[in-house]
UniProtKB/Swiss-Prot annotation:
It holds the Pfam family GATase. GO terms for molecular function: ATP binding; GMP synthase activity. ATP binds at residues 227-233. Keywords: ATP-binding, Glutamine amidotransferase, GMP biosynthesis, Ligase, Nucleotide-binding, Purine biosynthesis. Residues 5-199 form the Glutamine amidotransferase type-1 domain. This is GMP synthase [glutamine-hydrolyzing]. Residues 200-391 form the GMPS ATP-PPase domain. NCBIfam families: guaA_Cterm (TIGR00884), guaA_Nterm (TIGR00888), PRK00074.1 (NF000848). Pathway: Purine metabolism; GMP biosynthesis; GMP from XMP (L-Gln route): step 1/1. Its EC number is 6.3.5.2. Homodimer.
Length: 516
């Protein structure tokens, strides 16, 4: 079992993943587990420190989540954040009550020195720094052996410590960006208090993962579906580095790809990385299956079902395959275990869902310990071009769900050309990597126009350009009007069949990023 320098126990905070990301960004490897993780499992990971996350519960409620008190006896430092602080307070005999006024937002943090010295947790950070509060309960009485190490105007116990037991607790959230020096505080906990000296980065991860893959796969073969997206591209590059020709990467051209997408994928993997890529041309098959279909959900199901059929046929050609590779990421893994307890319904995550029963492959998920930004760094480490690693998310059903109405060659040609112009201009103006997604949608709407002296009655395209950090929420991008005008003029002048361009100014929620 891999050693984990910092174990984070999750009590359901919306910010828990941020704790892990902040620590990893400064080279400290950590993993998240539900608060009820058995103590023997935690001990087996040989952590040098434990962090108790925030959470929505109140510690004085009868069914409030609790931690096994044996974690305090492991002889390693513990840091509680928000709910974690309140839990530590109650576990050691202090008092927590419901606050008359909830405290949400920014506050100034002032240090309370210990024997004339600032607590090591705050070394290298400034007194009076801005921190982010988000709590409805407050500590009113400290447990025996604990002292105050920082306060705010509204929180007399903004940070507390029992230095003898190496237990520290913060009422604020150091993991969120609003806490000015929060990342430094977390780094101090890891480096100065827990004594972690190891530096974790993508170079180390790649070496470790390659060795693990080689040991596990041996002389067997691995099948991998390559879509050209970031995750599947990085999985393919990593596996090829590890096992070479024992990897069977399959790229299915469904005819629903963006301009030049197949060619780019073939160039990168066949020419640059020398990967023996299998390309299946299934354009006709997908378009025939989609004929006459206008309902978006039906489109998705048909595309998914057809992909499985094509992938299954290819898999049957390789009888000695034992493993199937998937690009599962760490957020998927975290979400699959509910903090509400083992009885809660588990949410499954499968990148290649609905595969037939006979395909009894063992799964290999080499990215399951990584966040998306780490996957991108790994891709660069493995030699993938930046353009591929930082490309915008592209939906599995491809352009089919960016065409409202029936999908056919004519519609695909229109949306593909409009999309290409949009992306060319976004890149030329240095905006591409600042945006989450930018694409064109062919609307099932025709309108009257005038071109030259002639009346036209042609198609409408909507431009969808959004900013987001994770795709869960998004806001429409405030693109300069002169750039929108340039894109619109180019599309109308260069793409026969389009005479109107509109800009989608809907955020998510209430809208979704994709139109279908």
């Amino acid at each position: 079992m891999q050693e984990v320098p910092i174990v984070i126990l999750d009590f359901g905070s919306q910010y828990t993943q941020l704790i892990a990301r902040r620590l990893r960004e400064v080279g400290v490897y950590c993993e998240i587990y539900p608060f009820f993780e058995p103590i023997e499992n935690i001990r087996a990971k040989k952590p040098q420190g434990i962090i108790l996350s925030g959470g929505p519960a109140s510690v004085y409620e009868p069914d409030a989540p609790r931690v096994d008190k044996a974690i305090y006896e492991l002889g390693i430092p513990v840091l509680g954040i928000c709910y974690g602080m309140q839990l530590i307070t109650v576990d050691f005999g202090g008092q927590v009550v419901r606050a008359l006024e909830h405290e949400y937002g920014k506050a100034k943090l002032y240090f309370d020195p210990i024997h004339g010295k600032v607590c090591p947790l705050f070394e290298g950070t400034k007194d009076g720094q801005i921190v982010w509060m988000s709590h409805g309960d407050k500590v009113t009485e400290l447990p025996a052996g604990f002292i105050r190490i920082a306060h705010t105007d509204n929180s007399p116990y903004a940070a507390i410590a029992n230095e003898e037991k190496q237990i520290y607790a913060l009422q604020f959230h150091p993991e969120v960006s609003h806490s000015q020096e929060g990342q430094k505080i977390l780094e101090n906990f890891a480096r100065k208090i827990c004594g972690i000296t190891s530096k974790w980065d993508m170079g180390h991860f790649a070496k470790e993962q390659i060795e693990k893959i080689r040991q596990r796969v041996g002389e067997d073969k691995v099948l991998c579906a390559l879509s050209g997206g970031v995750d599947s591209s990085v999985v393919t590059a990593l596996l090829y580095e590890a096992i070479g020709d024992k990897l069977i990467p399959v790229f299915v051209d469904n005819g629903l790809l963006r301009e030049g997408e197949r060619e780019k994928v073939e160039y990168v993997f066949k020419n640059m990385l020398k990967v023996p890529l299998i390309v299946v041309d299934a354009k006709e098959r997908f378009l025939n299956a989609l004929q006459g279909i206008t309902d978006p959900e039906q489109k998705r199901k048909i595309i998914g079902h057809t992909f499985i059929e094509v992938f299954e046929e290819e898999a049957k050609k390789h009888t000695d395959v034992k493993y199937l590779a998937q690009g599962t990421l760490y957020p998927d893994v975290i979400e699959s275990v509910s903090v509400k307890g083992p009885s809660e319904t588990i949410k499954s995550h499968h990148n290649v869902g609905g595969l037939p029963d006979w395909m009894k492959f063992e799964l290999i998920e080499p990215l399951r310990e990584l966040f998306k930004d780490e996957v991108r760094k790994l891709g660069l480490e493995l030699g993938l071009p930046r353009e591929m690693v930082y490309r915008h998310p592209f939906p599995g059903p491809g352009l089919a769900i960016r065409i409202l109405g029936e999908v056919n060659e004519e519609a695909l040609d229109l949306v593909r050309k409009a999309d290409t112009i949009l992306l060319e201009e976004i890149k030329a103006h240095g905006l591409y990597e600042k945006l989450w997604q930018s694409f064109a949608v062919l609307l099932n709407v025709k309108s009257v126009g005038v071109m030259g002296d002639k009346r036209t009655y042609e198609n409408t395209v909507a431009l969808r350009i959004v900013e987001s950090s994770d795709g869960m929420t998004a806001t429409f991008a405030h693109i300069p009007h002169d750039l929108l005008e340039l894109i619109s003029n180019r599309i109308i002048n260069e793409v026969d069949g389009i005479n109107r361009v509109v800009y989608d100014i809907t955020s998510k929620p209430p809208g979704t990023i994709e139109w279908e």
